[in-house]
Swiss-Prot record:
Confers DNA tethering and processivity to DNA polymerases and other proteins. Acts as a clamp, forming a ring around DNA (a reaction catalyzed by the clamp-loading complex) which diffuses in an ATP-independent manner freely and bidirectionally along dsDNA. Initially characterized for its ability to contact the catalytic subunit of DNA polymerase III (Pol III), a complex, multichain enzyme responsible for most of the replicative synthesis in bacteria; Pol III exhibits 3'-5' exonuclease proofreading activity. This is Beta sliding clamp. It is found in: Cytoplasm. It comes from Mycoplasma capricolum subsp. capricolum (strain California kid / ATCC 27343 / NCTC 10154). Coiled coil: none annotated. GO terms for cellular component: cytoplasm; DNA polymerase III complex. Forms a ring-shaped head-to-tail homodimer around DNA which binds and tethers DNA polymerases and other proteins to the DNA. The DNA replisome complex has a single clamp-loading complex (3 tau and 1 each of delta, delta', psi and chi subunits) which binds 3 Pol III cores (1 core on the leading strand and 2 on the lagging strand) each with a beta sliding clamp dimer. Additional proteins in the replisome are other copies of gamma, psi and chi, Ssb, DNA helicase and RNA primase. It comes from the Bacteria. Its main location: cytoplasm. Transmembrane segments: none annotated. The keyword Kinase does not apply.
Amino acid sequence: MNFSINRIVLLDNLSKAAKVIDYKNVNPSLSGIYLNVLNDQVNVITTSGILSFKSILNNQNSDLEVKQEGKVLLKPKYVLEMLRRLDDEFVVFSMVEDNELIIKTNNSDFSIGVLNSEDYPLIGFREKGIEFNLNPKEVKKTIYQVFVSMNENNKKLILTGLNLKLNNNQAIFSTTDSFRISQKILEIQSDNNEDIDITIPFKTALELPKLLDNAENLKIIIVEGYITFIIDNVIFQSNLIDGKFPNVQIAFPTKFETIITVKQKSILKVLSRFDLVADDGLPAIVNIKVNEDKIEFKSFISEVGKYEEDFDDFVIEGNKSLSISFNTRFLIDAIKTLSEDRIELKLINSTKPIVINNVYDEHLKQVILPTFLSN
């Protein structure tokens, strides 16, 4: 095996591949990065068993020149560290026998031990199924916006994931931890007439946005039990979570008694002063009391004290008398996902959830259940 390649491009692809690896896996070969060197391309492959990654490097995207085909199973840590420290534009990878990798530049070379490439499993990447295209920037933004309602440690496995529904030329992304719901709708153009309802694992939702940085194209392929993301020269595949995701749509009220319009930055500043965690680790709870022309924010944190603040920079429609309490951090996280200057806080009464969205765009909605305080 012998090839020359652009160092920065190789480092970028190896770094992305390494993030998929589960270093706790009992199979030692899965802790490596598998390079399959062909006549005109190098395939960079990793897998955790649930997630699988493959990038295709060639002369066009990485100045690749292959002198000898072959394969190698790299130990990521030392190879990545050395590639970061080198200054050369190009590096040459070659093998000595079957257990030693040589990395050369114009002024340096070093050798490093490798794993047995014959032990690496054959990874099947599924590239045929129900297909549709999305804007990678929009998907990246969407995942960050709905990620706030995900909880990797939820006892219900299905609630640890990100639900994706396709119907009526809409892609609906939903998450919930039972206390809050995040939902974002993207418009799509697809020839598919089949409704889709799948749930993507937490780890997949965590890693996918990192692969979408500077991406130009994103194709999504859904086949039974799997979802594949084709991102320019990268194929990112994931198992799906079995089970039925709850119908969160029924939690979205359609009629409200109180609608408060407020500047996003203004209310975030106020709420930040109530976001203090007590010594016992319990989350801060803020009581919001609407009283005609002002909103009273109140909080009492054991071993910290009581804090109150009046707020009048808002416009209100409907019922102007209401008292309701929420987890302060939940409110802050939800409001931060909204991108417009003015947002709406929609309420029914003190026992029903709040719905938060941008004033002029309801494609993103955040729902939070109230917290009930004992006297």
